[in-house]
Each structure stands twice: as structure tokens, then as C-alpha cells.
Amino acid sequence: MESITFGVLTISDTCWQEPEKDTSGPILRQLIGETFANTQVIGNIVPDEKDIIQQELRKWIDREELRVILTTGGTGFAPRDVTPEATRQLLEKECPQLSMYITLESIKQTQYAALSRGLCGIAGNTLILNLPGSEKAVKECFQTISALLPHAVHLIGDDVSLVRKTHAEVQGSAQKSHICPHKTGTGTDSDRNSPYPMLPVQEVLSIIFNTVQKTANLNKILLEMNAPVNIPPFRASIKDGYAMKSTGFSGTKRVLGCIAAGDSPNSLPLAEDECYKINTGAPLPLEADCVVQVEDTKLLQLDKNGQESLVDILVEPQAGLDVRPVGYDLSTNDRIFPALDPSPVVVKSLLASVGNRLILSKPKVAIVSTGSELCSPRNQLTPGKIFDSNTTMLTELLVYFGFNCMHTCVLSDSFQRTKESLLELFEVVDFVICSGGVSMGDKDFVKSVLEDLQFRIHCGRVNIKPGKPMTFASRKDKYFFGLPGNPVSAFVTFHLFALPAIRFAAGWDRCKCSLSVLNVKLLNDFSLDSRPEFVRASVISKSGELYASVNGNQISSRLQSIVGADVLINLPARTSDRPLAKAGEIFPASVLRFDFISKYE
């Protein structure tokens, strides 16, 4: 995609006086950067003054030649809300349907969206859109119109070739309409073309991250936590040996007793020719300032009880030798987490070391498999049935990545049963991961059910193999992933889309949510598909270089292709110039397992 220049103008008396209170402007700039590649974004804050607003907009239109300007704030009913009035005087063409579309989609989220008066229109070669001032509303509005912006810019700029390209891509697609849940195919084209555009993987991920809300800002909580105690809280011995005064020199010393880990520090007098036998981690006596390790001593005498009474110190003691001072590892009021780490092992262990037992909130997840043909692995297989492997696979994947499945259920191909089950599940869970029922068959009811339940379907198809019908939908803070029913498709789309969303909701940093990626060399030629393909492969290490061997037949129904799969190789779509991925070529690969190297040569 070519570069689009954006401007984000925050219009608010409060933010103009206190810029740190502007949250909507930074959110918009972040969303633009995440959604559009090679994008230039400038921003500013102005007060709710009509003349000043117009002056800034004119400068951006004429001098900066921005293609899209998004204003945030000043669209309500308050006396100083004048953004639409300031904008209208600059517009050569108004775009009422675009404004209506934003309003209608926003009303699905809150009835108060009806109180926004934002305008959309064209001034010169610039598209101007008035968005509300709240952070939440800005995010929702941007998600509504982001996919339309490139085509709108092409139309305004009379970029004929790009306009024709977009028209060609959408030509023949059926218009999205309500589908009767009990309807079967009539044989007409409208039944056989998906109303959902096929979105690129990265665009789908951007939509997911911009939609899913974190259950808690774990990163913020952790980064602001200070240590309530010193670690160690006392001077601790680093080694097994003898605690003494460093001024006492080497030679024979009388052993006064033994101090073990867990004993209280003693404050008894200690002469220069005396010492205490001490264990690793034990507290030093108050008057001792060093430890001589047991290897640098020689036992001279035992008392009548078999306890050490005399020992020869073979080295000169030095102050601070083998002693951890108070607070050496962590001092009171130090930040506990100098950097973020998504690992619950790290987080819980470090918090436990300072006496803090943090209960990490995890998203509640349910697994649903649809299909009248499915039979539980515990039951006898009957004619026309197949065993349900998806429920087991998805449940185990959740556990493997540190999450729990609260509920599982298998549904027959019934609109009403599917609707009732989803309603019940969303009463108690945050995410439903469903396999099957999202394609174009006349028994695929899932998308119709979602529409009936007033979920917003953000994505109905992805430009990917396997997994094209992958669906993502939301309603407020409830999220639905519809994975294809073929086991391998469900496996791939879980890793690429559902897992990152659940991690993000759990408080992980966005950059840590997706699978780790490394580069691998192909061992053999592989025929490319018309869609970008994620191929299951095992990894072989040869002299420090990583090679990928494709795991046999990659058909989406063949679950055996995940056996021994270490990575998903990300292969590009086929072109006339490049029909093959050739042996020796390097491609990015998403890592599936912690132990991702199957063989060393």
C-alpha cells in the first residue's frame, strides 16, 4: 500500500491547557501506525475556538497537503462544541453517508453515540472526519472506517488505476444481508459468494488487538510495584564456612557454635580468635563481617559431643568476603520489575520472593465444536459419524500455553441450539473458541447466530491457507473466534489469531502475544498456493543453520501433518514469476514448541 499522510487534531480546551490529558489523539496516532504501512502522521492540540480550528485545518490542507485529517473532540451538544461548525465552512463536498455509517456502527456500542454531531467531507484533496473525544469512542470509530480510507483517498485523488484495482477485487461479491437461519441454498449467486472481504493476516491481527480489552493492565501494575522488604533482609553467608572478624587474621580459632539457614542472627560478643560455623544462606552474627569457605580451613579438634571446637583458618580473612549485604538482591522501595516479562513463572516467583502473592487474572475461555457428524472419542463410532478431535486439540493447546478451558460442548448443526449455547456460555466466559460452522454451507449457522445476537463481525474471511473462513466477532467485552472445522485449519488459526488475543486480554505486551518468529531454509522445493500459506514443518539444525522439512501432505483435514511440527513456515502467495518456494530459500517461520529443533546434524 502506498503512503497516506494523516493528521490527528485534538480539539479540547482542557487538553490544550494540559496536553498530558490528551488520550484520544495518541490512541488515534497509534491505531493509524498499526493499521497502515509507511504512514506519516502529524498531530496537534487546539482549543474549542472556531477560528483556531479552521486555521489549523487550512494549514494542514494547503501547506502540509495531508490526505486524511481526523479530528477528535468538540462534536457534542455543549456550548463550546464547535468542531462540526468549524469544519463545515472548509468543506467543498460533504459525505453524509460516511457520517451516518460511523453513527450507526457507534450506536451498536452505546445509545449515546446519537448525541454526536460529527461531519465527514472533502476539502481539496483531503478527507476530513470529525470523531468523538473519548478514547473508547475514537477507537471504535476508527475501526469502523479504517478499511474504507485507502479507497476514499484514491477516489478523491482520482487515482484511476488504484480505484479500478479495488473495484476489481470487490466485484462479484454478494452484498451483505440478513440470512434466514433456517434457509438452505437456492442455487443463486447470492447464496454462493461470501459477503465478507478476505483480509490479510496482519490486518486481522490489528483489528483483534484494537478490539480486545485487557482484563487488567498487568504491565502497569507490575512496573509500578516496589519491594516492601530487603532481599536478603539480613547479612547472609554465600557459602558454607566460618563467620568471623576480618581483623582476626588467619590461624587457629575457637568454634563457638553453628548457625544454620533459618536461625535468627545472634548479637553475642565475638573475639578475633573466635568464629561460628555457618551454612549457606544463614545470617551472620552481628559482630562478624566475613566468611571463610570450608575449603580454606582445616579441622583441628572436636569436643566431647563430637562438635567442632578448634579450626585452622588457612587464608587471611577479608572484610565482606562471601557475604551478601542487606538488600543486595533487592532493596526496600526498589522497583521489583525493571522490565516486563510475560512468563507467569518469572512474575509469580519474583513476587513470592518479596512476600506478595499476586493472583494473575486469566481470561475465561470456552471451547465449542459444531457439526452433527461429530462423535465423542469416548463413544462408539456409528455410520456417518467422525470422532471429534478439535475439542481435545484446542483444550490441550490452551493448557500448553498456560490458560484454562472453563467449558466445552459439542453442538449439532442447529441455529437455535447454537444460539442458546452461545448465550449461556457468554454469561460466564470472556472468549468462545468455536470450530466449524463458519464456512458457506447451508448448515453453517455460526455467522447468522452472531448477527442475531448483535455481535459485530470484524472479520469473516482471511487471506490464508489453511483457515480462510476464520471469523472474529465481538460484543462489548465478549469475543468470539470461529475457526474452520478442518482440524489443521483450526490448529493454524488458533495459533495465529486466538492465542494472541487471549494473551493480550491477559495483560501481555502486544509485541509478545504472537508466536516467536525465526528464519529457516527450505530443504525441498514446495509449490506455492494462490493464498499465503502457513506450512507445518519440522526443524533440523545443520552446523548451526536451521532447515525446515515440510511434514508431508498439507491438506487441511490431515491432522497427521502436525505430528512433529516445530514451526509454521510463512510462504507467500504464488505469482506468475514465482510458482515455487525453492530449496535453500529463507522464509520466516512461527515457532510452535518450546523444544522446536527436532534433529541435529
UniProtKB/Swiss-Prot annotation:
Give the GO terms filed under biological process for this record: establishment of synaptic specificity at neuromuscular junction; gamma-aminobutyric acid receptor clustering; glycine receptor clustering; inter-male aggressive behavior; Mo-molybdopterin cofactor biosynthetic process; molybdopterin cofactor biosynthetic process
Catalytic activity field: molybdopterin + ATP + H(+) = adenylyl-molybdopterin + diphosphate; adenylyl-molybdopterin + molybdate = Mo-molybdopterin + AMP + H(+)
Listed SMART domains: MoCF_biosynth
**Modification Phosphoserine, positions:** S376
For this protein, the record's Pfam families field holds:
MoCF_biosynth (PF00994), MoeA_C (PF03454), MoeA_N (PF03453)
Stored PANTHER family:
GEPHYRIN, MOLYBDOPTERIN BIOSYNTHESIS PROTEIN
The name this protein carries in UniProt is Molybdenum cofactor synthesis protein cinnamon
Supply the source organism for this entry: Drosophila melanogaster (Fruit fly)
